[in-house]
Amino acid sequence: MVTLKFVFNQEKLKQARKTEEELLQPMREHAKKYDIAEPEHGFFVKDGEDAMCVIGMAVPDITDADPHYIDYMDEWTFDVDGEVEDCIEETKKWWKHERKRGVYYDEE
């Protein structure tokens, strides 16, 4: 089973005048397209041979569309059969690597 969990920082959302619903919308659209369930608020689940791919590809899609997305997160985890990856830290590592190539924005 593959899961993707979103936990937002309520204070940061409030300061930015954003809502969880607004920030979850891209994932919900992606989930609808790829038959990914959301059994709990902000918790997406899929099983099967394509589960890792279809859930995992949402992470770069979301952060490419909004590089500040992770600024609003307390937790964002990708779990493949119990092996958990911190999407916030992995995104920061990716940006650091890409910045060396002059591709992504600088962290504040």
PLM features: residue spans?
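Short, extreme N-terminal segment that most often corresponds to the first beta-strand
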Residues: 1-14
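Short, internal active-site loops enriched in acidic
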Residues: 11, 49-51, 83
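Short, conserved charged micro-motifs
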Residues: 13-17, 52-54
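Short, flexible N-terminal segments of the mature chain
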Residues: 18-38
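Short, low-complexity, polar/charged sequence segments that are solvent-exposed and flexible
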Residues: 22-27, 41, 63-64, 97-98
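Short, intrinsically disordered low-complexity segments
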Residues: 32-69
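Short, mixed-charge low-complexity intrinsically disordered segments
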Residues: 62-93, 97-99
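Short acidic DE-rich linear segments
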Residues: 103-108
